[in-house]
């Protein structure tokens, strides 16, 4: 059996600090932004020329903190630690001193902070989009739409911690019910790490109530 090595061209920097709470697929949270820090020697401006003409790109990345298991899902439990995501390209940031690419600004990513990236390719609508495609077992899934609520105190605290864009992204993530499908306990308090903070909440009768926001590094 031949082993193949992949070169890391960059790392993801975002507010998702753990797997719990990351969107189940890319493109589900338009407000959530991420940054790919491009490493030398792959940061040469010539390599990215023309990429800004594309609205979306493909990312090939590493499930560096995942386990291994099955093929018939899009979950991180796979025999090869590779993930594939289509994301919106918002901007390309250049280093003013040397003209090299510092990184890419994205939205709609479903990737953990610190994840290695192996490759970037433009999304081609005329070949990559298939409106007639069937989704197998996912065709019967209902996308959760919870009502997200904050107390006045929590809302005020969030405004001192996060930008308005980060708050909207947090609402989008929570509205999609970040819990695993097997966890549905009305009296349980759940927690997820977001932007360096522990966001705790309860869910009952379709309402997600954020009850606490505390620093993850007291």
Residue ranges and their predicted role:
Residues 102-138:
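Flexible glycine-rich active-site/ligand-binding loops centered on an Asp-His dyad
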Residues 112, 204-218:
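Enriched for short, Lys/Arg-rich terminal
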